[in-house]
């Protein structure tokens, strides 16, 4: 929920700490 970016999340998926990952957007 801190270093969450749509681009990074789309590639590796949701990052640690990231919740509610939907449609390429995290947190």
Curated annotation (Swiss-Prot):
Cellular localization per UniProt: Secreted
Tissues and organs where the protein is expressed, per its UniProt entry: Developing endosperm.
One function term, GO molecular function aspect: alpha-amylase inhibitor activity
Main location: secreted
GO cellular component terms attached to this protein's record: extracellular region
Keywords carried by this UniProt record: Alpha-amylase inhibitor, Protease inhibitor, Secreted, Serine protease inhibitor
Domain of life: Eukaryota
Disulfide-bond pairs as recorded: none
Family assignment from sequence similarity: Belongs to the protease inhibitor I6 (cereal trypsin/alpha-amylase inhibitor) family.
Note: CM proteins would be involved in the cooking quality of pasta.
Annotated function: Alpha-amylase/trypsin inhibitor. It could be involved in insect defense mechanisms.
Protein name (Swiss-Prot/TrEMBL): Alpha-amylase/trypsin inhibitor CM17
Organism: Triticum aestivum (Wheat)
């Amino acid at each position: 929920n801190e270093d969450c970016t749509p681009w990074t999340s789309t590639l590796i998926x949701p990052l640690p700490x990231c919740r509610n990952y939907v449609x390429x957007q995290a947190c």
